[in-house]
Curated annotation (Swiss-Prot):
Protein name according to UniProt: Alpha-ketoglutarate-dependent dioxygenase FTO
Entry GO CC: cytoplasm; nuclear speck; nucleus
Keywords tagged on the record: Cytoplasm, Dioxygenase, Iron, Metal-binding, Nucleus, Oxidoreductase
Stretches for region Loop L1: 211-222
Region Fe2OG dioxygenase domain: start-end pairs: 32-321
Residues given in the record as Fe cation binding sites: 229, 231, 301
Subunit comment: Monomer. May also exist as homodimer.
GO MF annotations, alphabetized: broad specificity oxidative DNA demethylase activity; ferrous iron binding; mRNA N6-methyladenosine dioxygenase activity; oxidative RNA demethylase activity; tRNA demethylase activity
List of residues binding 2-oxoglutarate: 203, 289, 310-312, 314, 316
Keyword Transmembrane part of the UniProt annotation: no
Length: 501
């Protein structure tokens, strides 16, 4: 699987500034459903956006999913994330929880969310209450439904694009009635993203509790709950499916008027394009929309806030090559292959002093510490409310990490060994110093993030924990937490040995 290429933040900022300069003091045009050419624009420029109206979703599924949303809210299982954007920490206005396949994670804005497992009969996962078990099962059922709808829509889309047999007038009517053109002789059409969604990111926001929401800057669509973006870290050309639920709806919402300002909307635009009008699609409670195939890559989307609290369940195929518990455990096992433990004495030794092997081990050491342990504990004790799965997983990963601390100490002892040649010492130092310097720098960065004013503003169970951390007098740890003196000594040793070559 291939990760969608993401522009670096600097490139995005340049493009954004250029776009705003081109717009000047005005706004770009956009169409909403009140405009006569709305459906023509949808069919010609946004054809990979599909709306599944609430009336076409099974009633019992509506009931269980909407109750599940409220259950998450009542049980305090929706959390604002302390994320990093453009080098600065911010608290998200939207509260979230990730639910999905056991052991899966999803990373956004330098924050790794850990999926609370949806029901798996083969997994002995403990949930804090029976009620939450049913809650997670509801999103698993919704996932199955949205996947089946996605497969159907991709099949229709593939046939449409292949034969181009319909006219815009027909297309307009079929969008209005929530029916896409189809044929009975569909076969052998290449489809993208047939893999099932592996996670869903649940979002909740009550705009009445938000003191400030930014105005949408390009089109003047309204106040944004979520600004323009591509969903990141997804499998390339994979569909994103969204279930929308606004509750405590006013009588104004029931009449179905598209221009009712209390309604929520999703906005779409072609990325960095000022020629094509934007599209603003109204959402009724219970509606689902699918961003099919490569739409998430070629277009950007935003969410325009209504007046009522809103939940959404956003189902996606997260890029999982380096984001699963199975993956990081495999990495640990690979690194620990070089560690020998004497079964009689318990003494530890390294099997191999090959510089590349030692360097790779230190890189895995960093990966476990900063992509998993510190990411998990930076989110406080929030997961205790949801499941024991990740606490147990982190306990196991911490054991492996401590073994790698031992391996680092053994490398340092080996460098002091006079049996190594000058060339061997230099090669080892050149391979281990970069990850050690990175470790020292990242430990400092994570400490500062945990001490920030924003971190202290979070609820007690969500306040970041700076962990792992230990004092120099901790005899259970083979190395000090602060590696400054060790790194300085190693750099000096490298310089001295290079002079001997």
């Amino acid at each position: 699987m291939k990760k969608r290429g993401v522009l670096c933040e600097e490139e995005k900022e340049v493009k954004k500034r250029k776009l705003l300069e081109q717009i000047g003091d005005g706004h770009l045009p956009y169409l909403s459903s009140k405009d006569d050419t709305f459906y023509d624009l949808w069919g010609s420029c946004y054809s990979k956006l599909t709306l599944l109206q609430a009336k076409h979703v099974p009633v019992d599924l509506h009931h269980t999913v909407q109750n599940a949303f409220l259950s998450l809210l009542r049980n305090g299982c929706l959390f604002q994330d302390l994320v990093r954007l453009k080098g600065k920490d911010i608290i998200t206005p939207v509260s979230r929880i990730l639910i999905g396949r056991p052991g899966y994670t999803y990373k956004y804005l330098n924050t790794r969310l850990f999926a609370v497992p949806w029901i798996n009969d083969e997994l002995n996962t403990q949930y804090s209450t029976r009620n939450l078990l049913e809650t997670y099962k509801a999103f698993s059922d919704l996932n199955d439904f949205l996947y089946s709808q996605t497969v159907n829509e991709l099949q229709k889309l593939g046939k449409i694009h292949k034969d181009n047999f319909f006219q815009h007038s027909e297309y307009k009517e079929q969008i209005k009635s929530d029916q896409r053109p189809s044929t009975s002789n569909y076969e052998n059409v290449k489809l993208h993203s047939m893999e099932s969604f592996n996670v869903t990111l649940i979002n909740y926001m009550d705009p009445q509790n938000m003191s400030f929401l930014k105005e949408e800057p390009y089109f003047g669509m309204g106040k944004m709950a979520v600004s323009w973006h591509h969903d990141e870290n997804l499998v390339e050309q994979s569909t994103v499916a969204v279930y929308n639920y606004s509750y405590q709806e006013s009588s104004n919402d029931v009449n179905g008027e598209d221009e009712d300002p209390t309604r929520w909307h999703v906005g779409l635009k072609i990325a960095w394009d000022i020629e094509t009008p934007g599209l603003l699609m109204p959402l009724s409670s219970g509606d689902c929309y699918l961003m099919l195939d490569d739409l998430n890559k070629t277009h950007q989307h935003c969410v325009i806030a209504g007046c009522q609290p809103r939940f959404s369940s956003t189902h996606r195929v997260a890029e999982s090559s380096t984001g699963t518990l199975q993956y990081i455990k495999s990495q640990c096992n690979s690194a620990l292959q070089n560690l020998h433990m004497n079964p009689d004495t318990g003494a530890a030794d390294l099997k191999n002093l090959e510089p590349n092997v030692l360097g790779q081990t230190e890189e895995i050491h960093n990966e476990v510490e900063f992509e998993w342990l510190r990411q998990f504990w930076f989110q406080g004790k929030r997961y205790n409310k949801c499941t024991t799965f990740w606490k147990e997983a982190m306990t196991e990963l911490e054991i492996h990490w401590k073994q790698m601390e031992t391996m680092t100490s053994l490398v340092l002892k080996a460098i002091e060994n006079e049996n190594l040649t000058v060339d061997e010492k230099c090669n080892i130092l050149k391979n281990i110093l970069p990850p050690l310097v990175e470790r020292q720098d990242l430990r400092h960065d994570w400490r500062e993030r945990c001490r920030s004013k924003l971190a202290k503003m979070l609820p007690p169970d969500q306040v970041p924990c700076f962990y792992p951390y230990w004092n120099d007098d901790n005899k259970t740890m083979p190395l000090p937490f602060d590696l400054h003196n060790i790194i300085s000594a190693l750099q000096k040793t490298l310089e001295e040995n290079e002079l001997k070559l």
